[in-house]
């Protein structure tokens, strides 16, 4: 049995759910998490955790708040020396066999200072560590995203990138691609059939969502705004893991942002997606662009573009046919690679 310290960015559930899924695959080893925000919730599942500050992305009004994100990053970098000193003491006491980072800043730096092996497992490095044509109109957005990834989050020795799309890697000796890492809960469900569209648009306003969907012929099941009365064709539901997965597995399609976790789960169940990327969130835009390029759905750059939703819904059967028979489950292969690296 090995001891693994697993650093996780705690500003969104995507990082944490992927890390917990990987930890579940490595259950014969001792896993100790490190991070801030949502990471501390792992204690409820019986894991130990080390508290760390976050260099997270801050969202406001449905878009990345660049100035607030930069201010938070600068504040934590000014405290970096003290944070790293405390973390080194923790690692020296634990003496881990491996350090893993899912887009966490401090753990790979402390590992390097102590001469500990460190690997990265995330989706974000598909942005910087693979080769692809920049989507039209996104050069500045790509640059603004790539710089912090390279400067702040690329200190591991090796990168295991989880992704539903697979462009060529830039450095085959250090970078490997795997299929999506799925949470355990979706794997307990099987895909069904239905006519509704599941809607989860983090950061969008209720007004914008209702203006887009109200009065259309199709029925929409909407999460993220709490439970409400809804309209003739729109049902608003309260947050529920089981309820969400039930509605996902029986949906005809999904309308969501470009987050990799929900895209991967949707594709696992054969559900096409119409993507509305969060503003100035290049990783989400890139995901959505590949969704469209691969024929798995449509990229909808503005929530007001009703004509794109019209086209998407008309082509749901064709998009579903493109997804049929494909695998979007890379948990076992990625875990086997980690075992080989121990």
Regions found by a protein language model. Name each.
Residues 150-161, 165-168, 296-342:
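Leloir-type glycosyltransferase catalytic cores
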Residues 6-10, 29-79:
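Conserved nucleotide-sugar phosphate-binding/catalytic loop shared by glycosyltransferases and other
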Residues 66-98, 105-106:
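Conserved nucleotide-sugar donor-binding subdomain of glycosyltransferases
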Residues 6-20:
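A short, glycine/small-residue-rich beta-strand->loop->alpha-helix junction that serves as a flexible
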Residues 267-315:
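Catalytic binding pocket for nucleotide-activated donors in carbohydrate/polymer assembly enzymes
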Residues 129-204, 225-226:
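A nucleotide-sugar donor-handling region in carbohydrate enzymes
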Residues 98-102, 120, 247-286:
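A donor-sugar binding/catalytic signature common to diverse glycosyltransferases
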Residues 181-253:
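Donor-nucleotide binding loops and adjacent catalytic segments primarily
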